[in-house]
């Protein structure tokens, strides 16, 4: 059972905006959840792992920490972290999974996760199960990281990251087994455009099973799909764009 002081109720938007209109398709329903409050911004401290818990809101597992002053908090479980381990934050910590270091002090080729984009703002990058980034270059002001997408990005050297990769690496190999498990997760069916009527999708219509009748695939709103660039503004901190599938 989760710690009562570290959970709260929350209302999921299930793909709707404030007016109730669908802005993200294929979302809705699902089992009721309670949000686990996670400590994304870890201060210099020492704590002991008291339990490893399931979190319905993310793919990673959570580690429950007990601090020496009696406080408790949740963090993402790093790969290899187990009950009874001691985790530290700060430059005095050893280079072990789950310990937090400033990027400027982390050696090259080290795997890291839960990375801050802005110093003292809290972890924002690389938080999904099994993910890790690699430190590839360092300068006095910035550290270059290779992210899971293949993108190489500069981040301020005084930002912090957690050593190691996120645990629960087998998450990507799970088999849901039936449509009902997707519905429990709040994922609604995805209908092919070619199975719709012409009024509903540019690919719709035709007699029986037939092609889309267009020179290229289109979105439900008539815009080109597959291979069209969506990022307009360049980012000065991105040294190499992510690898395309």
UniProtKB/Swiss-Prot annotation:
A Pfam family reported for this protein in Swiss-Prot or TrEMBL: Ribosomal_L2_C
Cellular compartments per GO CC: chloroplast; large ribosomal subunit
Molecular function, one GO term: rRNA binding
Species annotation: Cyanidioschyzon merolae (strain NIES-3377 / 10D)
Gene Ontology biological process terms, A to Z: cytoplasmic translation
Domain of life: Eukaryota
Family: Belongs to the universal ribosomal protein uL2 family.
InterPro entries: NA-bd_OB-fold, Rib_uL2_dom2, Ribosomal_uL2, Ribosomal_uL2_bac/org-type, Ribosomal_uL2_C, Ribosomal_uL2_CS, Ribosomal_uL2_dom3, Ribosomal_uL2_RNA-bd_dom
Keyword annotations of the record: Chloroplast, Plastid, Ribonucleoprotein, Ribosomal protein
Residue ranges of the region described as Disordered: 192-216
Subcellular locations according to the entry: Plastid, Chloroplast
UniProt keyword annotation of Zinc present: no
The protein's name: Large ribosomal subunit protein uL2c
The keyword Plastid appears for this protein: yes
Quaternary structure and partners: Part of the 50S ribosomal subunit.
């Amino acid at each position: 059972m989760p710690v009562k002081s570290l959970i709260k109720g929350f209302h999921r938007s299930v793909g709707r905006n404030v007016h109730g209109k669908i802005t993200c398709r294929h979302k809705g329903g699902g089992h009721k959840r309670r949000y686990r409050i996670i400590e994304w911004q870890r201060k210099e401290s020492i704590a002991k792992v008291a339990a490893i818990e399931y979190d319905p809101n993310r793919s990673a597992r959570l580690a429950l920490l007990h601090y020496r002053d009696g406080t408790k908090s949740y963090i993402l479980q790093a790969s290899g972290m187990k009950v009874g381990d001691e985790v530290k934050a700060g430059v005095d910590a050893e280079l072990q999974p789950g310990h937090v270091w400033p990027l400027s002090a982390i050696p090259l080729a080290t795997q890291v996760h839960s990375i801050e984009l802005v110093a003292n703002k809290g972890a924002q990058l690389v938080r999904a199960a099994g993910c890790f980034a690699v430190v590839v270059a360092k300068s006095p002001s910035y550290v270059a990281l290779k992210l899971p997408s293949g993108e190489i990005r500069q981040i301020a050297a005084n930002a912090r990251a957690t050593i190691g990769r996120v645990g629960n690496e087998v998450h990507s190999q799970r088999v849901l087994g039936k449509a009902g498990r997707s519905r429990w997760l709040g994922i609604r069916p995805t209908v092919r455009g070619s199975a719709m009527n012409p009024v509903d999708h540019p690919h719709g219509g035709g007699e029986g099973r037939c092609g889309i009748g267009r020179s290229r695939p289109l979105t439900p709103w008539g815009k080109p799909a597959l291979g069209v660039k969506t990022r307009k503004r360049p980012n000065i901190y991105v040294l190499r764009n992510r690898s395309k599938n």
